[in-house]
Amino acid sequence: MSLDPATVRRIARLARIGIDESDLHALQGELNGILGWIEQLNEVDIDGVEPMVGTGHAALRMREDVVTDGAARDAVLSNAPDAAGPFYTVPKVVE
């Protein structure tokens, strides 16, 4: 399937995209390329392939629900512009 300039203008108008006439041919080429990829996907034989509806069958690793400090406090505070002890120091924003 190949799009002509009139169809590209119509698609742009429906999508409320303003395009210049100078950009029309570039956009036409991009859209034709996308449609070409879709045509390639339509040629794939998917007989006997069950659709994937989610990852519900995947087993998740479980860990204990324990509160930690992340074991990286010093590394995190090293990125702070100013720190006071184990805390970030920020300018006062409320008077």
Swiss-Prot record:
GO molecular function (one): ATP binding
Catalyses which reaction(s): L-glutamyl-tRNA(Gln) + L-glutamine + ATP + H2O = L-glutaminyl-tRNA(Gln) + L-glutamate + ADP + phosphate + H(+); L-aspartyl-tRNA(Asn) + L-glutamine + ATP + H2O = L-asparaginyl-tRNA(Asn) + L-glutamate + ADP + phosphate + 2 H(+)
Keyword DNA-binding: no
Pfam family, one: GatC
Keyword Repressor recorded: no
EC numbers: 6.3.5.-
Keyword line: ATP-binding, Ligase, Nucleotide-binding, Protein biosynthesis
Domain of life assignment: Bacteria
A biological process term (GO) from this entry: translation
Uppermost EC category: ligase
Oligomer and partners: Heterotrimer of A, B and C subunits.
PANTHER family per UniProt: GLUTAMYL-TRNA(GLN) AMIDOTRANSFERASE SUBUNIT C, MITOCHONDRIAL
Function: Allows the formation of correctly charged Asn-tRNA(Asn) or Gln-tRNA(Gln) through the transamidation of misacylated Asp-tRNA(Asn) or Glu-tRNA(Gln) in organisms which lack either or both of asparaginyl-tRNA or glutaminyl-tRNA synthetases. The reaction takes place in the presence of glutamine and ATP through an activated phospho-Asp-tRNA(Asn) or phospho-Glu-tRNA(Gln).
UniProt similarity note: Belongs to the GatC family.
Protein name in the entry: Aspartyl/glutamyl-tRNA(Asn/Gln) amidotransferase subunit C
Primary gene name: gatC
